[in-house]
């Protein structure tokens, strides 16, 4: 069954199955068809998110276990709702809490699970979980031989972690081994294990297993193997087959060796009715492979499409110039992207790169192709850096035609570099990727292609989302998952084109605007888009605020903290997160915001990897930056806070109009709207873990019961999220009543004419005799005050929407006000206050 709307709920951190069951009546009242659950399987004890699974065949006891899960399912069914769960086939926790992983540590290659994990068994399994080298930790007395508290067997004990010994190294000598205190003897015993403990700092270059991105605590799984697939999906398939679960969200599909084969097997097992979406980041213009048996993506590309509507393309260059002035240098985003990718290849993914290079050189040697290591290294490095998408989708048979064309374009681009690799090396690597090798080398070439494809995705993600987007902060709203790293022009025409394509290619994909992975909540993003409408006003505010807080800038050995560019980021981030109703004299509210903002600042600085990072933190710089950030929100900093609050008001108001437009589009454009917990009202969250905070569900439920069309006339209702919640509920119910229109209806752009034609977006959805007309304001920063109270009809004087022939013969009902009208050929916006119209044909 295809959902009409999903609601993402984050379990753990206090959210249990029973608490979720209590929310089901609210979700039904809101108009949700499917609850969309974060991972529910047993994960590490300290897990806050559930992606670090330790047992894929057990439901997490701490959130209610199997019994609690069944109570939730029963309540969902009683209310007529379905359930989608988030599954994680790519990885599990490399934790001693994981029985499979523990078995591998104990028995090494002989473990029945040795091939479940993606481990390089040509060497000892590396365990990068020490605070220093093994020798240093041993010398400091941090490691000792102790019995496992659970089994009594001898282990290497490192604080509360007990690493099991291979039976052959202690059986028959248990008392002797447990009595070991001599450091040399302990070191010798360590050398005889199938694993080797090492410093966490050495993971990037020495890891012997595939990990999720840079997270050594998450080990890759070989689900391409049928046994592994069966073992990791046993409970998942049971839940689908028994009807408890109606849909699956596949986490990080690009991490798998063969996504197409995995999805084909999964589809075969769950049947045609199961709703399947994949977490897949698409570049602009990129499409999901046609032969994947899924309904679509989880919707990051939809966020990028919305920017086409809400960014002022005519003024964004002025914002860029202002940023470069503050920064003190022009920004070349292509060069910045290259620098970020180089850092990832050379440092953060050094081990993965080295392994790939060694494999290429081994194949060259087998084929007796003369290739110098330095030459192949340069060619491989440049190919990885030049990749414009997350990955290709080659199989044992080679690359599909579209990916061959992509690879050809990349190679040609690499050849134009100022210092290009040798053509022969590029040709050799291309042959490996396309499978153009003798039969004797096909297996190794396939292995190379798989490893290459599994590296380009993490490389892109960590370079763009988790480095570049924290370094270059011209417009934080544009630094989002799925956004283009290189500047482009924004236009409604492109948005319309992308929606037509979406309707044609993945009409059942999720359309998300906030997730647990987005860099900020959808309404923070909507507010920050308005900076592109008023770059001069923003720049004047910034200069004034910097001057007000100048005395808290520190002078360090490596420069000032914050630098000018840092302040641009800090004030813009604070602009996005500031709660609409927070008053500058509200000490409790300021302190709550300060706690959240501090955590964001620390993460932003480390992700940028400029003056500090996760590997080597710069304590002096971080302290100075955090002190500055704290001072911004100090209750006694009233001169600044009052000015900040006052200056923010037009951005807040324009942002709320953007929020409404964004909501209306999400709920009426092609795709299945996904509501992230609490975002049916307003979501001004920062990057995780801030975006996983639980919303006030009691208030949301109470508020929903009281909402009427009158919310539009009350400014407070805009500020507290009632307007968005009212519109969300009204349109979700409309979707339930007109499922086929929203699923199959054509997407038809509508043309605006008149004085404010560039300030509005319009389109229609048409399916047989059913029609929907959607009109929403955009780029109204300069005159948005009246829009919040819907009293500014003069703003729209002389602005009409042209209604084409097949639509202008209908009578319509305004879904948001219940007014009935017959628009004719020209729909006058002046007679419909506020500029937001959702008209459903009678």
Predicted feature descriptions by range:
Residues 119, 123-201:
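DnaQ-like (DEDDh/DEDDy) 3′-5′ exonuclease domain used for proofreading
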Residues 1-45, 53, 57, 62, ...:
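Carbohydrate-interacting/catalytic domains
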Residues 82, 247, 275:
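Hydrophobic "anchor" residues on beta-strands that sit immediately upstream
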Residues 72-119:
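Hydrophobic or amphipathic alpha-helical targeting/insertion segments
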Residues 90, 250-256, 716:
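Conserved short loop/turn motifs at secondary-structure junctions
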Residues 50-52, 94-107, 263-265, 291-293:
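Short low-complexity, flexible loop/linker segments enriched in glycine and/or proline
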């Amino acid at each position: 069954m295809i959902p009409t709307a999903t609601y993402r709920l984050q379990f753990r951190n206090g959210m249990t199955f029973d608490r979720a069951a209590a929310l089901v009546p609210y979700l039904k009242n809101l108009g949700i068809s499917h609850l969309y659950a974060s991972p529910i399987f047993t994960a590490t004890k300290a897990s806050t998110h559930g992606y670090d699974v330790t047992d894929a065949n057990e439901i997490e006891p701490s959130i209610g276990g199997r019994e609690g899960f069944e109570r939730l399912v029963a309540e969902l069914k009683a209310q007529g709702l379905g359930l989608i769960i988030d599954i994680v086939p790519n990885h599990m926790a490399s934790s001693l809490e994981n029985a499979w992983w523990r078995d591998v540590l104990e028995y090494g290659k002989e473990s029945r699970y040795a091939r479940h994990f993606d481990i390089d068994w040509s060497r000892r399994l590396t365990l990068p979980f020490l605070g220093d080298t093994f020798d240093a930790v041993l010398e400091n007395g941090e490691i000792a031989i102790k019995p496992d508290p659970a089994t009594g067997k001898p282990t290497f004990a490192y604080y509360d972690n007990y690493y099991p010994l291979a039976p052959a190294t202690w059986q028959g000598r248990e008392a002797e081994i447990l009595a070991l205190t001599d450091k040399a003897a302990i070191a010798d015993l360590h050398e005889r294990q199938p694993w080797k403990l090492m410093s966490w700092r050495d993971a990037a270059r020495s890891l012997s297993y595939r990990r999720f991105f840079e997270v050594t605590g998450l080990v890759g799984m070989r689900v391409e193997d049928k046994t592994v697939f069966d073992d990791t999906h046993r409970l998942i398939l049971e839940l689908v087959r028994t009807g408890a679960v109606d849909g699956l969200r596949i986490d990080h599909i690009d991490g798998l060796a063969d996504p197409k084969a995995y999805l084909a097997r999964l589809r075969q097992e769950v049947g045609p009715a199961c709703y399947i979406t994949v977490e897949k980041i698409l570049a602009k213009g990129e499409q999901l492979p046609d032969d994947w048996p899924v309904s679509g993506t989880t919707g990051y590309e939809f966020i990028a499409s919305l920017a086409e509507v809400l960014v002022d393309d005519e003024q964004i260059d002025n914002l860029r110039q202002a940023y470069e002035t503050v920064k003190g240098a022009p920004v070349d985003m292509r060069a910045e992207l290259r620098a970020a990718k180089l850092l990832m290849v050379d440092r953060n993914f050094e081990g993965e790169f080295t392994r790939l290079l060694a494999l290429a050189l081994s194949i060259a040697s087998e084929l007796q192709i003369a290739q110098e290591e330095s030459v192949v290294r340069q060619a491989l490095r440049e190919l990885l850096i030049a990749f414009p998408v997350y990955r290709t989708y080659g199989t044992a048979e080679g690359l599909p035609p579209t990916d061959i064309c992509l690879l050809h374009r990349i190679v040609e681009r690499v050849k134009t570099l100022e210092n290009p690799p040798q053509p022969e090396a590029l040709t050799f690597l291309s042959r490996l990727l396309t499978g153009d090798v003798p039969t004797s080398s096909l297996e190794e070439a396939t292995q190379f292609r798989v490893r290459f494809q599994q590296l380009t995705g993490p490389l892109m993600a960590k370079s763009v989302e988790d480095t570049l987007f924290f370094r270059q902060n011209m417009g934080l709203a544009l630094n989002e998952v799925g956004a283009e790293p290189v500047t482009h022009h924004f236009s409604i025409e492109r948005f319309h084109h992308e929606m037509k394509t979406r309707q044609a290619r993945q009409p059942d994909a999720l359309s998300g605007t906030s997730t647990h992975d987005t860099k900020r909540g959808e309404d923070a993003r909507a507010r920050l888009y308005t900076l592109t409408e008023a770059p001069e006003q923003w720049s004047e505010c910034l200069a004034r605020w910097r001057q007000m807080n100048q005395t808290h800038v520190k002078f360090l050995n490596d420069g000032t903290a914050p630098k000018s560019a840092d302040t641009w980021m800090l004030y813009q981030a604070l602009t996005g997160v500031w709660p609409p109703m927070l008053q500058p004299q509200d000490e409790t509210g300021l302190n709550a915001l300060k706690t959240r903002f501090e955590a964001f600042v620390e993460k932003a600085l480390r992700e940028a990897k400029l003056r500090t990072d996760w590997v080597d933190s710069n304590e002096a710089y971080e302290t100075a930056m955090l002190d500055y950030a704290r001072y911004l929100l100090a209750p006694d900093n009233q001169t600044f806070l009052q000015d900040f609050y006052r200056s923010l008001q037009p951005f807040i108001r324009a942002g709320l109009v953007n929020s409404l437009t964004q909501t209306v589009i999400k709920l009426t454009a092609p795709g299945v709207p996904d509501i992230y917990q609490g975002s049916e009202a307003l979501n001004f969250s920062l990057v995780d873990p801030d975006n996983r905070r639980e919303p006030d569900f009691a208030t949301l439920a109470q508020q929903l019961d009281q909402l009427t069309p009158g919310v539009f006339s009350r400014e407070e209702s805009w500020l507290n999220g009632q307007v968005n919640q009212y519109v969300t509920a009204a349109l979700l119910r409309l979707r339930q009543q007109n499922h086929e229109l929203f699923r199959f209806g054509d997407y038809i752009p509508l043309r605006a004419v008149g004085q404010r034609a560039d300030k509005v977006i319009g389109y229609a959805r048409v399916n047989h005799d059913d029609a929907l007309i959607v009109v929403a304001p955009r780029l109204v920063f300069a005159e948005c005050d009246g829009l919040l109270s819907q009293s500014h009809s003069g703003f729209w004087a002389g602005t009409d929407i042209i209604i084409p022939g097949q639509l202008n013969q209908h009578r319509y009902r305004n879904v948001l006000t219940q007014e009935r009208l017959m628009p004719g050929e020209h729909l006058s916006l002046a007679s419909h206050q506020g500029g937001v119209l959702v008209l459903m044909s009678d």
